[in-house]
């Protein structure tokens, strides 16, 4: 009898829990729909964009739930860095690589790497050293050198979504490629830095530890990139050889999606950077795999990846806004509100300084290597690049949760203050800086200060070769590529020279093996039948 009562109670509890989950999911999906509708209606608004709209809706929903539960809870779901890194981040980063305009991205690759990798390292050291000097004297709690270095990595991760939503990549392709490319490389570098810090004993730092740390950092960077390229090439080879689309377009679309996700998860399994892996997987897939599938699959994959990325981004901002008011996080820091506000202000100031510490000096160095005036970064563009990296987003929150939480919510004052301070910086920078982005860009770039109303990327961007000619069309042939005549040309115009040898290598070896535009052998019923028939 007792067992039957216990089983009945357990069943009732399970049913109640199940019902609550279904209600939460329904409400969250409804909120996502509201974010999309309101974001569309406010598209022309001077101050608000879709990201800020989702954040505001999340905050308002959190307030309503907080009032309805009498201060016990403010969220439908608990923020989980696992949910963020495993399910939400992969489609966003993959689509960034898949839809990127490769002509501009690789044309400015050295500058992007300079800002995204070297610049992030400068920002990391600036914020870390300042945090050690300032916070160690403020009696925050039991924070050590490793925690302060982690703070540097956490607040070096930018979120340039607000700026990218305002910039038009057709009107300002150079600036857009710099902001976009730096944002992706920055996130990858910050996460690689953060993960590398967890593998070392940072209590006793000497030259050997620093060298080992740098070696581990470059190993993660290069290995992750190689894995992404390998996964993209493997998908291209399989689809090209099997001609899956001849029998089922669903299978080739599914294979592209699953192999892209597999590359990310495999990188995480091997303790590499999933962001770098899936980003370069997206670039390689758009260069080879996408041209090996049928025309209907090309349209499907292009819009499917863009839609998944858009939903994930909206989900993230809604998620962050709703979870920001979680009472369980704030109650441990509530007895020191002044100190929490002071730390948030200091961190915000360090973000501003750390960003300026590399944007303007590195822009100056980059301009020294450029001959053409249109390739140099003007001071107005430098201000936009600096501003674009001031916002902090879900990456910073996820890393902060990973570092400063224990068993869900921390009981330590120092850790609690760092969590709440991170949330404060993210909310303030996204809301305040984000609202000022449109007016600022309209002031600095009046000719291109109109909201982007087009699709995330035009079909043309998916046809562009991996490295295209500097002046020509994305679809041009290789006949107009000038062969470099001397070592001097290699030194003075390295991009053109690398482009020439890359195209020779790509045409001779890569495309015959992995496919790509115009280089897949004709076979009746194959994905290239239509393209050959139209010639």
UniProtKB/Swiss-Prot annotation:
<feature type="region of interest" description="Disordered">
    <location>
        <begin position="452"/>
        <end position="478"/>
    </location>
</feature>
<feature type="transmembrane region" description="Helical">
    <location>
        <begin position="115"/>
        <end position="135"/>
    </location>
</feature>
<dbReference type="GO" id="GO:0005774">
    <property type="term" value="C:vacuolar membrane"/>
</dbReference>
<keyword id="KW-0630">Potassium</keyword>
<feature type="topological domain" description="Cytoplasmic">
    <location>
        <begin position="1"/>
        <end position="21"/>
    </location>
</feature>
<feature type="topological domain" description="Vacuolar">
    <location>
        <begin position="403"/>
        <end position="415"/>
    </location>
</feature>
<protein>
    <recommendedName>
        <fullName>Sodium/hydrogen exchanger 1</fullName>
    </recommendedName>
</protein>
<keyword id="KW-0812">Transmembrane</keyword>
<feature type="transmembrane region" description="Helical">
    <location>
        <begin position="76"/>
        <end position="96"/>
    </location>
</feature>
<feature type="topological domain" description="Cytoplasmic">
    <location>
        <begin position="195"/>
        <end position="218"/>
    </location>
</feature>
<keyword id="KW-0813">Transport</keyword>
<feature type="transmembrane region" description="Helical">
    <location>
        <begin position="138"/>
        <end position="158"/>
    </location>
</feature>
<keyword id="KW-0472">Membrane</keyword>
<keyword id="KW-0915">Sodium</keyword>
<feature type="transmembrane region" description="Helical">
    <location>
        <begin position="265"/>
        <end position="285"/>
    </location>
</feature>
<feature type="topological domain" description="Cytoplasmic">
    <location>
        <begin position="437"/>
        <end position="535"/>
    </location>
</feature>
<comment type="function">
    <text>Vacuolar antiporter that acts in low affinity electroneutral exchange of protons H(+) for cations such as Na(+) or K(+) across membranes. Plays important roles in the transport of Na(+) and K(+) accumulated in the cytoplasm into vacuoles, and is involved in salt stress tolerance.</text>
</comment>
<feature type="topological domain" description="Cytoplasmic">
    <location>
        <begin position="286"/>
        <end position="304"/>
    </location>
</feature>
<dbReference type="GO" id="GO:0051453">
    <property type="term" value="P:regulation of intracellular pH"/>
</dbReference>
<feature type="topological domain" description="Cytoplasmic">
    <location>
        <begin position="68"/>
        <end position="75"/>
    </location>
</feature>
<feature type="topological domain" description="Cytoplasmic">
    <location>
        <begin position="136"/>
        <end position="137"/>
    </location>
</feature>
<dbReference type="GO" id="GO:0098719">
    <property type="term" value="P:sodium ion import across plasma membrane"/>
</dbReference>
<dbReference type="GO" id="GO:0015385">
    <property type="term" value="F:sodium:proton antiporter activity"/>
</dbReference>
<feature type="topological domain" description="Vacuolar">
    <location>
        <begin position="326"/>
        <end position="344"/>
    </location>
</feature>
<feature type="transmembrane region" description="Helical">
    <location>
        <begin position="47"/>
        <end position="67"/>
    </location>
</feature>
<feature type="transmembrane region" description="Helical">
    <location>
        <begin position="416"/>
        <end position="436"/>
    </location>
</feature>
<feature type="transmembrane region" description="Helical">
    <location>
        <begin position="345"/>
        <end position="365"/>
    </location>
</feature>
<dbReference type="GO" id="GO:0034486">
    <property type="term" value="P:vacuolar transmembrane transport"/>
</dbReference>
<feature type="topological domain" description="Vacuolar">
    <location>
        <begin position="97"/>
        <end position="114"/>
    </location>
</feature>
<dbReference type="InterPro" id="IPR018422">
    <property type="entry name" value="Cation/H_exchanger_CPA1"/>
</dbReference>
<feature type="compositionally biased region" description="Low complexity">
    <location>
        <begin position="454"/>
        <end position="469"/>
    </location>
</feature>
<feature type="transmembrane region" description="Helical">
    <location>
        <begin position="305"/>
        <end position="325"/>
    </location>
</feature>
<feature type="transmembrane region" description="Helical">
    <location>
        <begin position="219"/>
        <end position="239"/>
    </location>
</feature>
<dbReference type="GO" id="GO:1901002">
    <property type="term" value="P:positive regulation of response to salt stress"/>
</dbReference>
<keyword id="KW-0050">Antiport</keyword>
<feature type="topological domain" description="Vacuolar">
    <location>
        <begin position="159"/>
        <end position="173"/>
    </location>
</feature>
<keyword id="KW-0406">Ion transport</keyword>
<feature type="topological domain" description="Vacuolar">
    <location>
        <begin position="240"/>
        <end position="264"/>
    </location>
</feature>
<keyword id="KW-0739">Sodium transport</keyword>
<dbReference type="Pfam" id="PF00999">
    <property type="entry name" value="Na_H_Exchanger"/>
</dbReference>
<feature type="transmembrane region" description="Helical">
    <location>
        <begin position="174"/>
        <end position="194"/>
    </location>
</feature>
<comment type="similarity">
    <text>Belongs to the monovalent cation:proton antiporter 1 (CPA1) transporter (TC 2.A.36) family.</text>
</comment>
